[in-house]
């Protein structure tokens, strides 16, 4: 009887171990089956189709974004060139009417203010038509050549929007960021709280290169700058610099 009892006890002791092994075996079989199903789906492309579709959609969106950016930059370049030509013609007409040479504008703040007022219209019209936050021109003259670093100062007019929200131009206020105080008052322009009468060309990327341009085609003198922080503001911008030529082809300043 003892051998039979011992055999029964050994069988009972082995029972849970065999059950655990059977459960583990079934679990492994389920994992293998799931792995086989996933491998089949991936091999047939069922699972990869959404990924390919997403990748294609992103590629199309990227191409559309680049195309829209190129189109906008081309439009801005064309508008800036047209404005530069108008500024050059107005400058020639102003000097002819005054009977003075360009360099005689130096140290003559009243005449400079009068010129800035005349050049306001093409500047303002371009700002209203272009998709940009501001626009300005700088001429190679200054109201006071005796100031320190006077060689860096440029008489000019800088108009910008008071708010940079993406709204239509007619819904935004235009303020004077740079320009003679007399000009701003005569045009009834609000002056920026960090207003200055003239531009500092040393702080404008690309201005030296543009004013040194000696080519015959205005388009060849245009220059897009890298993204840069705009002085006295929190705004970061890309600048398009275009030379301003007089009737003789001499560079008299730059428009941005």
Segments predicted by a language model, with ranges:
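Residues embedded in well-ordered secondary-structure elements
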Residues: 69, 124-126, 228-233
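Extracytoplasmic/periplasmic ligand-binding sensor regions of membrane-associated signaling proteins
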Residues: 179-255
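Structural recognition of the beta-strand scaffold that forms the well-ordered cores
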Residues: 136, 255-256
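Non-catalytic regulatory/interaction regions at protein termini and inter-domain linkers
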Residues: 1-20
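Juxtamembrane extracytoplasmic/periplasmic/luminal helical "stalk" adjacent to the first N-terminal
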Residues: 16, 20-112
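Sequence-level detector for tyrosine residue identity
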Residues: 8, 25-28, 66, 120, ...
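Extracytoplasmic/periplasmic sensory segments of membrane signal-transduction proteins
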Residues: 77-211
């Amino acid at each position: 009887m003892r051998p039979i009892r011992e055999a029964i006890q050994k069988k009972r002791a082995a029972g849970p171990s065999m059950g655990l092994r059977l459960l583990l075996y079934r679990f492994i079989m389920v994992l293998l089956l799931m792995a086989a199903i996933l491998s089949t789906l991936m091999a047939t492309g069922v699972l990869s189709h959404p990924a390919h579709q997403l990748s294609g959609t992103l590629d199309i969106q990227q191409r559309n974004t680049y195309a829209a950016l190129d189109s906008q930059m081309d439009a801005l370049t064309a508008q800036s060139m047209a404005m530069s030509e108008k500024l050059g013609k107005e400058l020639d007409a102003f000097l002819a009417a005054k009977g003075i040479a360009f360099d005689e504008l130096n140290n003559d703040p009243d005449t400079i203010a009068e010129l800035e007022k005349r050049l306001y219209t093409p500047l303002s019209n371009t700002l209203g038509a272009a998709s940009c936050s501001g626009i300005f021109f700088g001429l190679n003259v200054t109201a006071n050549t005796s100031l320190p670093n006077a060689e860096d100062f440029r008489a000019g007019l800088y108009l910008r929007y008071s708010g940079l929200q993406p709204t239509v131009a007619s819904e935004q206020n235009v303020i004077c960021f740079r320009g003679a105080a007399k000009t701003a008052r005569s045009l009834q322009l609000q002056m920026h709280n960090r207003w200055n009468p003239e531009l500092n060309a040393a702080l404008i990327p690309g201005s030296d290169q543009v004013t040194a341009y000696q080519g015959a085609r205005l388009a060849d003198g245009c220059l897009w700058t890298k993204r840069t922080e705009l002085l006295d503001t929190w705004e970061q911008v890309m600048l398009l610099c275009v030379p301003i030529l007089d009737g003789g082809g001499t560079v008299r300043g730059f428009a941005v």
